[in-house]
Design a protein with these regions (language model features):
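Post-signal peptide N-terminal segment of mature Sec-exported envelope proteins
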Residues: 30-56
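Bacterial lipoprotein signal-peptidase II cleavage site
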Residues: 20-32
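Beta-rich interaction/scaffold domains
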Residues: 51-115
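Residue-level recognition of short, structured coil/turn motifs
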Residues: 19, 96, 164-165
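Hydrophobic core
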Residues: 10-18
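Extended amphipathic ligand-handling, pore-lining, and cofactor/metal-binding catalytic surfaces
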Residues: 108-309
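Bacterial Sec-dependent N-terminal signal peptides
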Residues: 1-9
Length: 309
């Protein structure tokens, strides 16, 4: 009887252990499944978060691209100032990663992001209090700050020194440049109409317009046409020749201005190349090639004349 009792107890103990073992195994399996589901859910949420962030980043960049495209080649109007400011504010709000995503018909990260020098070194010469005599320097313009201050600004300063009794002011013919500089650097440069209106409002009597254009091309023609609309607003209006002077009757005619420019740039090229003279460069087998922007305008004949020179 005692042996049967011991055997029965042993059987019960083993059965209990087996049941307990099965229960532990089932619990572990359930816990593992729950953990896997949690990890999978977290991965899905993380992926969705990344994708959502990427969409948000691109949307922010696309918005800035739209604002840049709106002002890029825009003719100045009543909304230009506000739109330039809005585009810059939106750009400044982007992260560095978002800025790299900016892309539009004309827009890219360089529109606001490219370093072209210190804009504060450039004087837009758009002040009032002009007086009766104004010398208006008209250039196509450049959005490169250092070049604008040194090259265009250098010409303007030289004219100020040469004609102290005249007020020197600036105008650009390229609205695309004006908009870019204003949006990026908050520097406002007059276009030709703005500059002429400023002259009228300030009571200018004698106006001399000095273009920095190279030749009698489309920009020069448009400048002259614009001036015709204001000729009765001043007592005298004088328009200076572009750097290469008047257009001759044919490609063999080389006027004095073209000859001087040809000699000047050749001398500078020889000096930059380290030669004492053009003959020395020739003896050394060195040739100089001068490249121009080119134009479909009839003024392209100037290039042929230089070749004759």
């Amino acid at each position: 009887m005692k042996k049967r009792t011991i055997a029965l107890l042993t059987t019960l103990a083993l059965a209990t252990g087996m049941v307990a073992g099965c229960g532990s195994s089932n619990t572990a399996a359930t816990d593992t499944a729950k953990t896997s589901e949690t990890v999978s859910s977290e991965k899905t949420e993380a992926t969705e978060t990344v994708e959502s962030t990427e969409v948000d980043d691109q949307a922010a960049a696309d918005h800035v691209a739209e604002l840049i495209d709106a002002i890029y080649v825009q003719t100045r109007n009543d909304d230009t100032d506000a739109q330039c400011a809005e585009a810059k504010e939106a750009w400044d709000a982007l992260t560095d990663a978002q800025k790299e995503l900016v892309s539009g018909e004309n827009a890219d990260p360089d529109y606001f992001g490219r370093d072209t020098g210190d804009a504060s070194k450039d004087d837009p010469l758009n002040e009032d209090n002009i007086g009766e005599n104004e010398l208006l320097v008209v250039s196509f313009g450049t959005s490169f700050n250092d070049s604008r201050a040194e090259d265009i600004g250098g010409i303007e300063k030289a004219l100020e020194a040469a004609y102290p009794d005249w007020s020197v002011r600036r105008a650009f013919t390229a609205q695309i440049i004006i908009n870019h500089v204003q949006a990026r650097d908050d520097e406002k440069i007059d276009n030709v109409d703005q500059a002429l209106e400023r002259a009228v409002d300030n009571g200018v009597k004698n106006l001399v317009v000095q273009p920095t254009h190279l030749m009698h091309g489309a920009e020069y023609d448009e400048l002259v046409e614009t001036l015709d609309n204001y000729k009765d607003k001043f007592e005298t209006v004088t328009v200076a020749e572009p750097m290469l002077g008047e257009v001759g009757s044919d490609a063999t005619v080389v006027n004095e201005d073209k000859a001087k420019v040809a000699e000047a740039i050749t001398a500078e090229a020889v000096k930059t190349a380290g030669y004492d003279s053009l003959d020395a460069a020739k003896e050394d087998g060195t040739a100089f090639v001068f490249m121009g922007h080119g134009t479909s305008h009839s003024a392209k004949v100037a290039t042929a004349r230089w070749q004759h020179r």
